[in-house]
Amino acid sequence: MADAWEEIRRLAADFQRAQFAESTQRLSERNCIEIVNKLISQKQLEVVHTLDGKEYITPAQISKEMRDELHVRGGRVNIVDLQQVINVDLTHIENRVGDIIKSEKHVQMVLGQLVDENYLDRLSEEVNDKLQESGQVTVSELCKTYDLPGDFLTQALTQRLGRIINGHLDLDNRGVIFTEAFVARHKARIRGLFSAITRPTAVNSLVSKYGFQEQLLYSVLEELVSTGRLRGTVVGGRQDKAVFVPDIYSRTQSTWVDSFFRQNGYLEFDALSRLGIPDAVNYIKKRYKNTPLLFLKATCVGQGLVDQVEASVEEAISSGTWVDVSPLLPSSLSVEDAAMLLQQVMRPFGKHASATVFSDTVVVSEKFINDCTKLFSERMHQKAEKEMKNNPVHLITEEDLKQISILESVNTNKKDKKDERRKKATEGSGSVRGGGGGNAREYKIKKVKKKGRKDEDSDDESQSSHAGKKKPDITFMFQDEIEGCLRKHIPDAPEEFISELAEHLIKPLNKMYLEVVRSVFMSSTSASGTGRKRTIKDLQEEVSNLYNNIRLFEKGMKYFADDTQTALTKHLLKTVCTDITNLMFNFLASDLMMAVEDPATITSDMRKKILSKLTEETKVALTKLHNSLNEKSIEDFLSCLDSATEACDIMVKKGDKKRERQILFQHRQALADQLKVTEDPALILHLTSVLLFQFSTHSMLHAPGRCVPQIIAFLHNKIPEDQHTLLVKYQGLVVKQLVSQNKKSGQGEDPSSDDLDKEQHDVTNTTRKELQELSLSIKDLVLKPRKSSVTEE
C-alpha cells in the first residue's frame, strides 16, 4: 500500500512540473542542414563535411586530430592514412599539412609523409646501434631500410653526428658513416699493407683482394702519403688505373733509366712503360729537363746519337757518296723513328742540301746521283741513233719539234732561209718557161712555217716553260732495267734503296735521253745539209713523174666498164697515189726532223702524227690529200695533190705530148724487162696482158691481178684471134693451177685425202708442164720484134 502511494506522489510531481515548465522550439534535421549551409556560404561558419556526410568538423579539429595521429604513430605518418582516419577529403588534409609545418618547426613533410624530430632521433639511435655493430653504414642501405630520400637522410644524420650517432661522415664520400674504431683499424691495415709494397701496384686490385672500402682507402692513402708516413706516390688519381709506386722502386727505376740512357744514348717509351712508368714522355721531360733531347714517335734520342748521324751524313755529302744510317742506330729503333731522326738531321741543311733521302734511312749525295746518271750516257746515244733509224716519227714529240725549231731560228735568218729555199727549188726544176716545154706549168707557194719561230730573243724562256707543261712521251729504259745496271754499280746497296733510286732516275734519264735524241737529230740534220739540196731537186722530179704517170693511168682506165674502173681506181689510189703522198709527207717530215729513210714505210697513223705537227695553213691541204686516198676518184686526188704541192712549195711539171711518149716508152720497157726474167705463170699472164693493152690502145694501165680477166676480155677485138685464143688458154691453165694450189693448202694433213692428193698431184704436174710449154709463146706476143707505131715512139 505504501508503494502505491509513493508512485502516486511521483506522478503528481511530474504533472506539476509539466504545468509550470516553459515551452521550447525544436528544429528538424533538414532545417539544421539548410541553416549550416547558409552560414558556410556566407562564410560565417568554417566547417568541413566528413566523407559520409553525417558530421561536420572544423579545420582546427582536423589539425588536432592530425597531430594526435602523428604522435600515436611515433612521429611518422602518411597523409593518405590520415585521410582514412579523419574521414575527410585528402585536399583538406593537404591544406592543414602546410599550417602544421609552419606552426611546428620540428615537423617536416617528406615524400608525402609527416616526420617529426622525435622520429628522426629514434632513427638515429637505431643507425648508431648498427654503426657500432658493423663499424660502418652506408646511406644507400639506410634509404632502402627506412624508405627515405638520401639527401634528407644524410642531412638528418649529419646533424646528429657526435650527439646521438658516435661516428663521422666520410668527407670524400658523404654516403658512408664510419666509427673511429673502424677508421683506425682500416688505417692500420692500409699503412701496413702499403709499407710492405716494393713495386708498382694497382690500387684497385688491393681493394677487391683485401675488402677495403674504396673511398676510405683513397682518403687514408693520400693522408699517409702527404704526411710522409708512406714513402711513395699515387699515380692516376682516384681512378681504376690508379697505381701506388713506392719510393724504393722509383729510385731503382730512375737508376736503371739513367744507366741505360748513359750507355746507349736513347730511351724507348715501351721499355719505360714495362718498368711501370705510364707516361714515359712526361717522365723523361721532367727527368732530363736540362738535357737536349729529340723526341720521336716511339723513342727519345740523345744529342750524341744525333751528332753521330749528322757527321755521317755530312761525310757522305762532302765525299759524293751515300750512307745508310740504319746501322748507326740502335736495332730497336723503328724505321719510322729513323726517318724522323734523319729528317731532323737534314733540316739544318735547308732547301739547298745537295742530298736526297731514299728508303727513309739512306742519304744519297747529288754527286752520286749524277754519277749514276752518267752510267747510261753511252747507252742513250746508241739507243737514240737506233730509234732514229727505225721509227723517228714516233721518237720526237711535238714539244721537241717546237724546241728544235726555236734553236734553228736562232742560228738562221728567216728571210734568208726562205729566199735560199726558193733559189734551190728553181735550180732543181728550171725556170718557168724552160725545161718543161711550152705547155709546162710550175706551182710555187709560201714555205712551210714552223711554230716557235717567233720571239727568237726569248727562246730559252719559252723552251723551259713548254718543257714544264709537257712531259716526254718516250721511254729510255724501264725501272727493272735501270735497277739491274745500278746493282752492278753499287752491289752492296739495299734492295729497297736500289728500287727507289731507279724510280728516282727514270724521269731525269728520260729527259736526258730526249736531249740526246735532239742532239742526234740536229747533228744528222747538219751533216746532211748538202744532201737536202739534192733531195729537193730529186723530190720535185719524182713527184712530177708520178703525177704524170697517174694522169696516163687514169686515161687507160677509161676503156673499161664502171665496175672495172672502180677496182682500177682503188688499186691506183692504194699504190701510186699513196707513194706520191708519202713522198710529200716525208718531205715535210724532214723539216720537222721526222723523216724516214724509205717513204714507202710511212703508214696512215704516221701521216696523222706528222699532220698534227704542221701549221694550220699546210695542215688543211695535206689533210685533204691524206683523206682523198680513201675516196674513189682520181680527179679529186689530183685536185688535192695540186693544192698540197702548192702549199708545200713543190713545183710540178705537167707533161706534154713528147713527155707522155717518153713515159709510155719507159713504162713499156720496164714491164718488158720484168717479163723477160720472171717464170711465174700468173705474173707472165699479168704483164703480157698489160703490155698488149698498151700496144693496142697506146695507153698505160696500172691494174691488180684480179682485173686480168677483164683486160683479156677487152683485148678480144684488139689483137689477132690466134693470139687471143692462146692468151685465153694460158689464162685457163693459170686459173687451174691456182685452184689446185688452194685445194692442196685447204686439205692440210687429212689422211682420208691421200687418193685425192695423188690425183691432184697428177693434174698439177700436167698443168705445170703445159704452162711451161706455153710461157715462151705468151712472152713472144710482146717481146718478139714487131712494127712500132709512131705514137709508141
UniProtKB/Swiss-Prot annotation:
The modification Omega-N-methylarginine is found at residue 433. Belongs to the UFL1 family. Residues 490-683 are annotated as: Mediates interaction with CDK5RAP3. Ubiquitously expressed with expression detected in brain, skeletal muscle, lung, heart, gall bladder, liver, small intestine, pancreas, spleen and kidney (at protein level). At 8 weeks after birth, high expression in the Purkinje cell layer of the cerebellum. GO terms for molecular function: protein kinase binding; UFM1 ligase activity; UFM1 transferase activity. It is found in: Endoplasmic reticulum membrane; Cytoplasm, Cytosol; Nucleus; Chromosome. PANTHER family: E3 UFM1-PROTEIN LIGASE 1. Residues 758-769 have a biased composition (Basic and acidic residues). Residues 121-250 are annotated as: Involved in CDK5RAP3-binding. The gene is Ufl1. The modification Phosphothreonine is found at residue 535. The modification N-acetylalanine is found at residue 2. Residues 200-400 are annotated as: Mediates interaction with TRIP4. This is E3 UFM1-protein ligase 1. Ubiquitinated, leading to its degradation by the proteasome. Interaction with CDK5RAP3 protects both proteins against ubiquitination and degradation via the proteasome. It comes from Rattus norvegicus (Rat). It is an enzyme of class 2 (transferase). Residues 2-200 are annotated as: Mediates interaction with DDRGK1.
